[in-house]
Amino acid sequence: MYTCAVRPEIASLSAYGPGMSIAEVRERYGLSRVIKMASNENPLGVSPLVRKVLATSLEEAFRYPQGGNPALREALARTHHVSPERIVVGNGSDEIIDMLIRMLAVPGRHSVVCFEPCFSLYPIQARICGVETRRCPLSPDYSFDLDALFSLVDAGTRLVFVTTPDNPSGYCPPLAAMRRLAKQLERHFPRCLLVVDEAYMDFAGASCGEAPRFSLLASGDLPANVAILRTFSKSYGLAGLRLGYGVLPAELAGFYWRARLPFSVNSLAEKAGLAVLRDSEFRRATLECIRSGRCRLTEGLRLLGCDVWPSEANFLMIRLPEGYDASSCFEHLLQCGIIIRPLSSYGMPDKLRISIGTKEDNEAFLEVLRSFLEKSF
C-alpha cells in the first residue's frame, strides 16, 4: 500500500485561493447576470485583433511552438527598448517567480525578502522550494518603508520582491526610492536580485505619458541587479491564456532558458500576445476605461462615506463607513450578482478590493453598495 510522503513544506502548505468565478456565483445564487470585479481582469474583455488571430490559428494547435518564443521576445524587446537577450516569457509571471527562486536560492541556506501583506505567490513558492521568507510590515498607510525592508537583507538573501503598484492598495513608491534600494543592494549584497513586479504598472498615472514617473522599466535606465516582471493578464486582457514576461540581467535570462520546462508558453498564447501588442486602439481604450473608472469609483465611494486609498492600479482598496461589516457587504454583493475581493486573506478583514469595471459595471456596483449601506443602517 502506497504511503504519501510529501515534504513537510508541502504538507503544511495552504493552497492559493483565487476569487469566486462567475459560473460559481451563477450556480450558487441562481443568477442570470453576474458582474466580476474581483480579479483585476480587463473590463473590455479580449482584443478584437486577438479574436481574429486565434480564430485562424486553431488549425496549428497540434504543432509545438518554436522553442524560446523568439518572435514574442523580439516584439517585447521593441516595446520596452531593451535587448531581446534580457527578455524571458513564462506561463504567467507566476512561472518566472517560481523559476527565479529555484534558480537563485538554495533550500536551507538562502532567504527571500518581501513585504507583508504581498502577492501570496512569493512566500508560497519560496516555501515550496524550502527557502526562508522574511517579511517586512507595510507602513500604517500601506506605503513602503524600504529602509526597513533593506534591514531584513543579509549575505544569504538572494531575492527581494517589491510589487509596484502594490496589491491590494495600489500604492506606488517613488522611483528615486526604488533606485536607492537597488543601489544599496548592489553595494552591500551584490548576489541579491531586486525583483520588481510591475504587473499593474500600465495603469499608473493619470495619462499614458506618466509611466516613467513610476516604472524602472519605462524610465529607460534599468539597474543591473534588477529584474522586472510584467504580465499579459491585466491591461492586455489575456488572463485565461497565462502569459507573463520578465526583463532580467542577460546572464540570468540565459540560465532561465536552460532551466525552464520546454514549451511552457503554448502557441496560442504566444500568437495572442503578439497580436495584442499590435492592437494600440484596444490598449488606448483599456487605459482610458480604467483611469476614468478609477476616478468615478473613487468619487462615488467617498460620497457613500467609504475610505478609499489612492491607487495607481486597476483596483481600489476601501473601508466601509464605521459600523458596517466588510464580510456582510461582500455576501450581499454576491447575492446581487457582483463579485468583489474581501481582504481577510491579506490580514485586512475590514477592507475590500474592487476591480475597476466598465462604466455600467461601476454604476451597478455603486447602486448595490448604496442599497446595502441604506439597508444596514
Annotate each predicted stretch with a short phrase.
Residues 2-94, 99, 376-377:
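N-terminal small-domain helix-loop-helix segment of the aminotransferase-like
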Residues 33, 83-87, 108-111, 156, ...:
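Short acidic capping loops at alpha-helix termini that bridge into adjacent secondary structure
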Residues 68, 225-309:
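PLP-dependent aminotransferase class I/II
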Residues 103-125:
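Conserved PLP-anchoring active-site segment centered on the Schiff-base-forming lysine
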Residues 127, 143-156, 168-233:
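Active-site pre-lysine segment of PLP-dependent enzymes
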Residues 140, 291, 303-336, 352:
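Conserved PLP-binding catalytic core of the aspartate aminotransferase-like
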Residues 176, 328, 335-336, 341, ...:
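PLP-dependent enzyme catalytic core of the Aspartate aminotransferase-like
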